[in-house]
Amino acid sequence: MYICFFFSTFVAQMGNIIQYIIEFLLYGNQEAANLVGYTSAESDWEKYRVVVVPNGQLGKNIVVPDLSDVYIETITHDGDERRFVIHTDIIYNTFFFISRAEELINPQRDDHGRFLAQYSILGENNRLMIPTVDEYARLLMKLLGLQLPTPSFSQIYLTHDIDSIANYRHLRGAIGGLMRGQWRAVFSSQRDIHNDPAFTFSWLIKQDKKIEGAKCIYFVKDTAGKGYDYPQYNLAGKDFAMVKQLLENSDAQIGWHGSYYGGKVIGPARLHRSHYLRCSIDQMQNLADMGVTEDFTMMFPDHVGFRLQTTRAVRWINPKTMSLTNLVLHPLTVMDCTLSNSQYMNLNEDEAYFECQRLIEKVYQNAGELVLLWHNTIITNEGYHRSLYPKLLNLLTETTHE
C-alpha cells in the first residue's frame, strides 16, 4: 500500500512539473498548454497540436541534454490538418537548466564551492549568451500559431548588495587606510560617514530614479563578520540607520544577503541573494524551507550570461527530490565585478558595455526580466563602474522608448 502511495505521489509530482514547464514555455498560456502533449505513444498524438517526444530521462536520470538543432516532424492528418512532433525533448532540456540539475552530475567547484561557467556545458559550447529555454518557447509558440511576446522588459530590478556600509568605519578598514597613508580619507570618514568612499547610497538612489517603474532592492547582511563575511555592520547601529532611512525615503526594498557560510533568515525576509553568489542546491532548498520566496542569486560569478537559459523568473524545481517549489528564481543578468575583476572576465569599460548591451537586447526581445547588480563599494572614483552604470541606465531608457 505504501509503495502504491509513494508511486502515485511521484506520478502526481511529475505531472505537475511537466505541466508547469509547458505553461512556462508558453508564457503562462494555460489554454494553449492543453494543445501540447508529452508522450511517446503514437496512438495519443492525434489528441494534440504539438507533441514533444520524451527521451525517457525526466524523473529517472540526469543526463547532459542534446543541444543540437531541434528536430521537428510534420504530420498531415485527414489531408490538411497538421500536427507537429518534436523529437528533441525540450521539456527535459528546460528542466535540466531551470533546476540546476547539471550541478548534480558535475562535481567541479571553485575554491568557494561555486559551480562556474567554465565548468558548465554552456561555457564549453559557447551558449552562455543564448537563452535556449526562451528559444524553445518561441519555437513552441510559432508551431501553435500563437503571437510571440512583444519585445519589452517584464520588470527591471536594480539591485545592490551592501557588503560594507563604509570603508573606514570599522577597525581593520581604518587601520588599513592609515597604513596606506590615506589619513585624510580615514579621518574624514570618521567625522562624517557621508565622506566615506563606500557610502554611495545617495548617488545610487539618484541614478536608479532615472528608470521609471524599476524595482530597487538593497540586500543587507546580518552576519558575525568573520572570514568572507567581513566586515560586519550593526543593523541596530546609527550608521545603518542612516542607510535604512535613505532607502525607505526612496521606496527601495530591503532583502536578505545570505551569509557566505549559510544561516538563518533575517526576520520575515522574502527576497534573497547569496553572498559571493554562493548557493548550493541544498542551500537553495533550505531557503525554500525557511519561507524565502524570491531569489536573485542565479548567475555564474565568472562570466555573464544566462545560467538558467531563460530571461524570465521561474519557479525552482529541486532536481534531487523532483518537487516544484514556491521559490522563484530571478535570473541575474549582470554583476559589476564579473565584468571587471581580473580573475573573471577582466574587461575594459567599452568591452563591458558591449557585453551588457548584448544581454539587455536578449532580455528585451524575449520580454524577460532585467536584473542588474552593482555594489555600493564599487561605485568609487577608481575603476570604471561609476561611469559604466549610468551608461547602462541610459541604454535601458533608450531601449524601452524604441
Predicted segments with their positions:
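Metal-dependent polysaccharide deacetylase catalytic core of the NodB/CE4 family, i.e.
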Residues: 164-168, 202-283, 298, 304, ...
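Histidine/acidic-residue-rich catalytic or RNA/ligand-binding cores of hydrolases
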Residues: 264, 281-286, 306-311, 382-390
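Short, conserved, surface-exposed binding loops centered on an aromatic residue
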Residues: 246-247, 285-286, 316-322
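His/Asp/Glu-enriched short active-site or ligand-binding loop at hydrolase and phosphoryl-transfer sites
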Residues: 291-318, 334-338
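Terminal accessory/targeting
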Residues: 1-234, 312, 319, 323-402
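Short, structured secondary-structure boundary patches
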Residues: 238-240, 268-270, 292, 313-321
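A subset of signal/propeptide-processing and intrinsically disordered low-complexity segments
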Residues: 156, 252, 290, 297-300, ...
